[in-house]
Amino acid sequence: MIKSALPILKRILPARLTNLYRQTIAGDNPPLGEFYPIQVGKSKNFSGREFGELLSNHNGRPMVKMAHFIGIYEDLLSPYKEAHSRSSNPLRLLEIGVSKGGSLEIWKKYFGETALIYGIDIDERCREISIPGVEIRIGSQVDQAFLSSVLKELGDPQIIIDDGSHHADHLSLTLEMLWPHLQDGGVYIIEDTHTSYWKEYGGGYLKN
């Protein structure tokens, strides 16, 4: 999927960033803070902060993220980790898009044993993923009945992360359905919004 996206990136990104993207595909490791995908556990340059150190030492399930996400996640999620450590109530996190299960594994390590971590995916193969303390449910992110059943188990989450289909229509529909269930003071994160510019994901430049 990374290689197939390269022609599109060439059209929409400055040459400098495209070169970084190409280098990463070839296996190089450019400086952190640029726009390029990294496989957590193989890139060992996340240092200086707790979340970065956790990623640097991760040797579990595969997880691919854009490098510039790491600092953003640290800034957004560290207050919830701190509040959770002082509360008797469990932190509740819902992630849309399981893939290989790497990010769910990371969230569990980061927030601790008492955190309630749920992941949803349409891929039946995700049923085979087993992560202690993490629940995975199979269904569509735009199926209201399915989402309601997951929320009935999990409760209203403090953190929602949409890393699912990345399709423009799905992003907006999922937001409409889940936003009313986000706890006051919670955070709703949508990853990879650059797909809003890609026609194959229902987007397009200056599309209304």
Question: What residue ranges belong to the model's regions?
Answer:
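A short alpha-helical cap/connector motif
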Residues: M1-I161, S165-I190, H194-N208
